[in-house]
């Protein structure tokens, strides 16, 4: 999982990316292609 400051550009890299908020953190999750996972930090 990558740690990035801005997730907007990462979300547009793949059409199945989902923006999810969990426990005060923002994640990009992708079930079909997990290498696109990222966390804002």
From Swiss-Prot:
<dbReference type="InterPro" id="IPR035977">
    <property type="entry name" value="Ribosomal_bL36_sp"/>
</dbReference>
<dbReference type="Pfam" id="PF00444">
    <property type="entry name" value="Ribosomal_L36"/>
</dbReference>
<dbReference type="GO" id="GO:0005840">
    <property type="term" value="C:ribosome"/>
</dbReference>
<dbReference type="InterPro" id="IPR047621">
    <property type="entry name" value="Ribosomal_L36_bact"/>
</dbReference>
<dbReference type="GO" id="GO:1990904">
    <property type="term" value="C:ribonucleoprotein complex"/>
</dbReference>
<comment type="similarity">
    <text>Belongs to the bacterial ribosomal protein bL36 family.</text>
</comment>
<protein>
    <recommendedName>
        <fullName>Large ribosomal subunit protein bL36</fullName>
    </recommendedName>
</protein>
<dbReference type="GO" id="GO:0003735">
    <property type="term" value="F:structural constituent of ribosome"/>
</dbReference>
<keyword id="KW-0689">Ribosomal protein</keyword>
<dbReference type="InterPro" id="IPR000473">
    <property type="entry name" value="Ribosomal_bL36"/>
</dbReference>
<keyword id="KW-0687">Ribonucleoprotein</keyword>
<dbReference type="GO" id="GO:0006412">
    <property type="term" value="P:translation"/>
</dbReference>
